[in-house]
C-alpha cells in the first residue's frame, strides 16, 4: 500500500553452524563446532523442528569450515562478552550459544542463546574430558582461565527419535521399548512420560542417541543402529 511501512532483510546463503562457549564474565572456553539439522524428514526436507540431529568432527571443525572461519566465530563470541562487560557492566556467566552462517562473504552471526543447544549439547558434552563441575566452579568464581577445558578428538553424530506425525500432528501415547539399546550411557530422554512402568511418547522429540567414533561416517553408523533399535 502507498505510504505503508516495510522491512528489508538481508539474505544470507551458506552453511549454518553453532559455536558454544563457557563464559565467566571475562574469559571464554570454546566448545567444538557443531552443525544442527532441523528439517523433519530425510533429504533435508519437511518443516523445521527444534533439531533432528547434529554432528561434530574429530578435529573440532566441520568439513565446510576452515580455521579462519572458526577463529572468526570465536572472535565474535569474545567480542560480545567483552562488550557486555565493558559497555554495560554486565559480566555474563554461563553458556553463550552462537548460531552462525559461513557465507562467501565471511562468517555471519545469526542469533544468540544464553543456554546450551539441544541437541548440540549432547555432542559436545559427550566429548568433554574435563570435570564439568570444575568448569561450573570456574564460571561462578571467575576463574575459568585457570581451567584447561579438554575434549576428546573424536567425531559424534546425534540423532533424535520422534513420534509418528511429528512435528505438525504427532501421535501421543505410543509405548517405547529401548531394550535393544547397546549403549544406554549415550541415550538421552526428552519428551517422554511413564505410565504403569512403561515409557510413553508425549508428543515432541522423544529421545536421542549419540554415536562416537574416529570419523563422522562411523559415528553415524552407530547412531543409526541405536536409533533403529528403539521400538515405538
Annotated model-derived regions:
Residues 54, 205-213:
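Short, well-ordered beta-strand elements within core beta-sheets of diverse protein domains
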Residues 172-175, 220-227:
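Short amphipathic alpha-helices in soluble, non-transmembrane regions
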Residues 1-119:
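Internal nucleotide-binding/catalytic subdomain
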Residues 71-96, 113-184:
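Active-site "cap" helix and flanking loop/linker of ATP-utilizing ligase/carboxylase catalytic domains
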Residues 3-4, 84, 225-232:
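Short arginine-rich
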Residues 171-208:
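Generic long, charged, amphipathic alpha-helical segments
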Residues 41-43, 146-148, 193-199:
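Short beta-strand/turn micro-motifs at beta-sheet edges
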Residues 21-23, 161-163, 211-213:
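Short beta-strand-to-loop capping motifs
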Amino acid at each position: 500500500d502507498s505510504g505503508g511501512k516495510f522491512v528489508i532483510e538481508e539474505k544470507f546463503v551458506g552453511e549454518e553452524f553453532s559455536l558454544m562457549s563457557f563464559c565467566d564474565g571475562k574469559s571464554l572456553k570454546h566448545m567444538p563446532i557443531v552443525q544442527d539439522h532441523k528439517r523433519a524428514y530425510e533429504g533435508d526436507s519437511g518443516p523445521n523442528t527444534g533439531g533432528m540431529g547434529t554432528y561434530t568432527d574429530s578435529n573440532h571443525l566441520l568439513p565446510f569450515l576452515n580455521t579462519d572461519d572458526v577463529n572468526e566465530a570465536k572472535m565474535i563470541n569474545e567480542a560480545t562478552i567483552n562488550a557486555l562487560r565493558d559497555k554495560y557492566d554486565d559480566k555474563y556467566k554461563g553458556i553463550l550459544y552462537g548460531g552462525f552462517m559461513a557465507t562467501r562473504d565471511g562468517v555471519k552471526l545469526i542469533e544468540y542463546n544464553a543456554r546450551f543447544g539441544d541437541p548440540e549439547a549432547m555432542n559436545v558434552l559427550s566429548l568433554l574430558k574435563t570435570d564439568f563441575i570444575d568448569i561450573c566452579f570456574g564460571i561462578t568464581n571467575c576463574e575459568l582461565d585457570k581451567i584447561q577445558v579438554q575434549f576428546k578428538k573424536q567425531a559424534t553424530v546425534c540423532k533424535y527419535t520422534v513420534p509418528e506425525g511429528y512435528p505438525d500432528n504427532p501421535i501421543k501415547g505410543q509405548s517405547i521399548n529401548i531394550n535393544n539399546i547397546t549403549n544406554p550411557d549415550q541415550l538421552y530422554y526428552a519428551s517422554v512420560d511413564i505410565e504403569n512402568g512403561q515409557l510413553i511418547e508425549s508428543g515432541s522429540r522423544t529421545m536421542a542417541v549419540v554415536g562416537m567414533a574416529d570419523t563422522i561416517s562411523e559415528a553415524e553408523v552407530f547412531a543409526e543402529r541405536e536409533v533403529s533399535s528403539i521400538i515405538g
